[in-house]
């Protein structure tokens, strides 16, 4: 729940920081962002008590919330309607290169050097980014279009919130990100409790950015002439199947032989499910950002693209809280169970006992997210039907 709240705030605050970035200029905003991230991560590296840790996390949330609308706004300003989707696909590929390499470096660092080194690594990376921004970041700025006062800033925020078509798509795509967010909410606990501590869920999660890096530019090029909602529809069709794959390990008996290697069913089906998620992201994210960028008037790129991230705010708040309840019901923490059941769970993981009744239906967790995906798909189909009918009526 705590992780969901902090993760959610990173996607809510960009609406406000995006408005501030439009006012102050993207260069100043990005300098402030990486300064906040450097100080925030450095604070986490120096302290261990609750209040300073919360202050450090708050600085990280605020810094990250500036980065999102500024970078996507820069992509929007630096591209035209012909190449905007491709520009966003390159941006998204680079983001996932960072995600993949970050996870790859941090996991062994945490194990071999201690978890306390991770904030210092993040602070150093943020400081390097700050130096690069100071040296080379020169975004296209149009001072005449920037909000001149708080009234114009608030008008831009209201313009974004009152765009009901945009708001509808934001709320519908939140269902997609609620499922994708289970990489960090349900999946780690599910893997450790159903396969054992020797399995590393962080490596499973790394499959997602790897797939995106490999395929996002090619897929975006393939769908470049599609309407954004059609590409998003493909993603919405795919995302329930990722949850189907993750649930399917419950129906596979024993290890699966893959090219002579004995692979645990959970490992196999998690990798398949996460790969499906990655491919679905390739259809959704660049075209969604392209759609969002076409809603913003000149000088208001930050606030509109900041508003576009609110779908993930709703997704993480819902997804992490929902995950907490589902894990407690179907895949509980062993230490919360009676001693006899906890012992049986340990023996079951070692292949020396039958599965405890408390874990017999753990895969039902993924059934719930299949439902979330199907509901979102139906809503998107209704959204496309309604908006196209509305457009036809206006043109007729």
Model-found features: residue ranges?
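Symmetry-related core transmembrane helices of the 12-TM Major Facilitator Superfamily/SLC fold
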Residues: 116-135, 362-382
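C-terminal ends and interior cores of transmembrane alpha-helices
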Residues: 35-49, 237-262
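Extracytoplasmic gate region of multi-pass secondary transporters
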Residues: 164-202, 320
């Amino acid at each position: 729940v705590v992780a969901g709240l902090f993760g959610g705030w990173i996607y809510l605050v960009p609406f406000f920081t995006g408005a501030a970035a439009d006012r102050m200029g993207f260069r100043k905003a990005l300098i402030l962002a990486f300064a906040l991230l450097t100080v925030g991560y450095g604070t986490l590296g120096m302290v261990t008590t609750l209040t300073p840790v919360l202050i450090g996390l708050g600085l990280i949330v605020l810094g990250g919330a500036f980065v999102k609308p500024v970078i996507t706004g820069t992509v929007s300003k630096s591209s035209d309607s012909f190449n905007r989707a491709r520009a966003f696909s390159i941006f998204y590929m680079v983001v996932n290169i960072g995600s993949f390499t970050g996870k790859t470096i941090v996991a062994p660092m945490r194990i071999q050097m201690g978890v306390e080194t991770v904030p210092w690594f993040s602070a150093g990376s943020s400081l390097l980014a700050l130096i690069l921004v100071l040296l080379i970041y020169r975004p296209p700025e149009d001072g005449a279009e920037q909000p001149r006062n708080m009234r114009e800033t608030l008008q831009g925020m209201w313009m974004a919130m009152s765009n009901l078509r945009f708001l509808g798509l934001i709320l519908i795509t939140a269902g997609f990100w609620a499922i994708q967010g289970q990489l960090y909410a349900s999946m780690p606990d599910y893997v450790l409790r159903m396969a054992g501590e020797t399995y590393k869920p962080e490596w499973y999660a790394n499959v997602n950015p790897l797939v995106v890096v490999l395929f996002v530019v090619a897929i975006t090029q393939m769908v470049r002439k599609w309407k954004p909602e059609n590409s998003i529809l493909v993603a919405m069709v795919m995302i329930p199947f990722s949850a189907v794959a993750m649930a399917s390990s419950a129906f596979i008996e024993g290890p699966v032989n893959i090219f002579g290697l004995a692979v645990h069913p959970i490992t196999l089906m998690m990798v398949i499910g996460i790969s499906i998620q990655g491919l679905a992201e390739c259809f959704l994210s660049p075209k969604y950002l392209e759609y969002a960028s076409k809603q913003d008037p000149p000088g208001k790129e930050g606030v509109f693209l900041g508003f576009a991230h609110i779908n993930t705010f709703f997704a993480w708040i819902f997804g992490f809280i929902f995950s907490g309840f589902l894990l407690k019901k179907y895949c509980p923490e062993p230490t919360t169970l009676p001693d006899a059941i906890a012992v049986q769970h340990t023996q079951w993981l070692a292949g020396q006992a039958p599965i405890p009744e408390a874990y017999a239906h753990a895969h039902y967790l993924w059934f719930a997210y299949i439902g979330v995906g199907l509901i979102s798909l139906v809503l998107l189909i209704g959204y496309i039907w309604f908006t196209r009918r509305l457009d036809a009526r206006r043109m007729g």
